[in-house]
Amino acid sequence: MSAKIGILAIQGDVAENVSSLVASIADLNQDATVHVVKTPEEISAMDGLVIPGGESTTIGQLSLVNGSQKVIKQKVESGMPVLGICAGMVLLASNATDRVVGKTEQPLFDFLDIELERNSFGRQRESFEANVSMDSIGISNYNGVFIRAPAISSTSDDIEVLAKLNEKIVAIKKGNIIGTSFHPELTDDLAVHKYFVNLVKETKQ
């Protein structure tokens, strides 16, 4: 049965994730389709969801206003896989601070019991690339692109740490929920998107 994978298109790196998912599905020869989604009705029809990088405050506020945040919570809590990238990972958190301004009052989905710091590696001009390994999910020597990237300082015991960089947690997993500080859609390496496609297909079966 075909799986529908959505990319939350309220704001952020939508087109890049579309390209990465389409290429991943083709390489894997999986029966899946990619959809750009905004409304609660569109999201409710998905089997998996990518929350892209962008401005986490904007995505959170607009998803709250249009009602999509409620549907996302319901779907994820019922088992739908979700991949939160950079700002998307911020939204997955229960608590977020900013390296410069401190405590934020932004709307969060509150899926993961983690302490997260936005812009943990610096602002736009401090963007960089670094090698990360996520050996527990079969991904090693991955070139991570970090742009105003968040990092996690602590997690609850039920969260698997997939990768660290300079002792900061930059990738996590809890069941059907995955978060990365870095932008997998900005590299030619499809490993993260392929892993997510397979997770969606396995969950749907």
Swiss-Prot record:
Source taxon at top rank: Archaea
Keywords: Glutamine amidotransferase, Hydrolase, Lyase, Pyridoxal phosphate
Pfam families: SNO (PF01174)
Pathway participation: Cofactor biosynthesis; pyridoxal 5'-phosphate biosynthesis
Catalytic activity line of the entry: aldehydo-D-ribose 5-phosphate + D-glyceraldehyde 3-phosphate + L-glutamine = pyridoxal 5'-phosphate + L-glutamate + phosphate + 3 H2O + H(+); L-glutamine + H2O = L-glutamate + NH4(+)
Active site per the UniProt annotation: C86 (nucleophile), H183 (charge relay system), E185 (charge relay system)
EC assignment: 4.3.3.6, 3.5.1.2
GO cellular component: cytosol; glutaminase complex
Disulfide bonds, paired cysteine numbers: none
Binding site for L-glutamine: G54, E55, S56, R118, I147, R148
GO BP annotations, alphabetical order: glutamine catabolic process; pyridoxal phosphate biosynthetic process; pyridoxine metabolic process
Protein's UniProt keywords contain Transcription regulation: no
Family note: Belongs to the glutaminase PdxT/SNO family.
Function: Catalyzes the hydrolysis of glutamine to glutamate and ammonia as part of the biosynthesis of pyridoxal 5'-phosphate. The resulting ammonia molecule is channeled to the active site of PdxS.
Name of the protein described by the UniProt record: Pyridoxal 5'-phosphate synthase subunit PdxT
Organism: Nitrosopumilus maritimus (strain SCM1)
Name of encoding gene: pdxT
